[in-house]
C-alpha cells in the first residue's frame, strides 16, 4: 500500500548504505501503542480495522527504533519530512510492514500477490512500454505486480506520490530519469509478496532484513 516517502532534511554528516527491513504485524501487540508519539497513537486510534492498527503501530515502532526523536513536518504534497539527515519510507501489505532507510532519497513498496485482471488494470496505470512488457509476459500476474511495485516505489522516492499521473513514469527498464536525476529500482521476492526498492543511488542491499520490533 502507499505510504508517503519521508525525507529527513537536517544536514548531518551521515554515511550509510541503504537498508531494507520487514516485520510481521502478527508478532506485535496492541499495547505497544503506548510507546508511540501522541500523534502516531492518535493515528492508530483512527484506524478502524485491527490489522490497520497493527500496521500503523509497526510503522511507529520502526520510526522510534531508527529515527529516535526526530521532528516530522509535512510538505505541500503531504510528504512527511524529518530533521535528522536520513531518508526513509514505509509500505505495508497483508501481514507485513516494510521500512527502507537511507542517507539519500528512497521509496519502497510491498504488495501481496493476488489474482486480478492485470491487463484491465494496467491500461489505467501503465504507459505503452509497460503495457507491451505486460502483454508479452508469460507470467502476467507476476509481471503486473513487478511493474506496479516499481512504479509506486519510484513515485514515492520522487516525492510526488500519486499526485502525478502513474502513466507519467516508465519503469519498464528498471530505471527512470527526470530533471537530471537518475532513479534506480531493485526487486525482491518475499513469500507471496512482491517488493520493490527505488533509490537515487544504484547501490542496493542484497537482502531484506527481517526484524522483530
Model-derived segments and their meaning:
Residues 6-213:
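Core catalytic alpha/beta fold that binds nucleotide/phospho-ligands
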Amino acid at each position: 500500500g502507499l505510504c508517503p516517502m519521508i525525507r529527513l532534511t537536517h544536514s548531518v554528516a551521515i554515511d550509510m548504505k541503504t537498508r531494507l527491513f520487514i516485520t510481521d504485524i502478527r508478532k506485535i501487540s496492541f499495547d505497544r501503542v503506548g510507546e508511540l508519539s501522541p500523534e502516531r497513537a492518535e493515528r492508530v486510534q483512527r484506524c478502524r480495522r485491527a490489522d490497520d492498527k497493527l500496521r500503523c503501530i509497526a510503522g511507529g515502532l520502526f520510526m522510534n527504533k531508527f529515527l529516535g526523536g526526530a521532528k516530522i513536518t509535512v510538505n505541500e504534497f503531504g510528504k512527511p519530512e524529518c530533521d535528522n539527515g536520513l531518508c526513509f519510507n514505509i509500505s505495508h501489505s497483508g501481514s507485513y510492514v516494510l521500512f527502507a532507510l537511507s542517507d539519500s532519497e528512497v521509496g519502497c513498496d510491498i504488495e501481496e500477490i493476488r489474482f486480478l485482471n492485470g491487463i484491465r488494470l494496467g491500461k489505467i496505470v501503465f504507459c505503452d512500454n509497460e503495457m507491451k512488457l505486460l502483454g508479452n509476459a508469460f507470467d502476467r500476474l507476476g509481471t503486473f505486480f513487478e511493474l506496479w511495485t516499481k512504479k509506486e516505489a519510484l513515485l514515492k522516492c520522487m516525492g510526488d506520490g500519486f499526485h502525478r499521473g502513474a502513466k507519467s513514469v516508465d519503469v519498464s527498464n528498471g530505471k527512470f530519469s527526470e530533471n537530471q536525476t537518475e532513479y534506480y529500482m531493485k526487486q525482491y521476492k518475499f513469500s507471496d509478496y512482491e517488493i520493490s526498492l527505488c533509490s537515487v543511488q544504484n547501490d542496493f542491499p542484497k537482502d531484506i532484513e527481517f526484524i522483530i520490533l
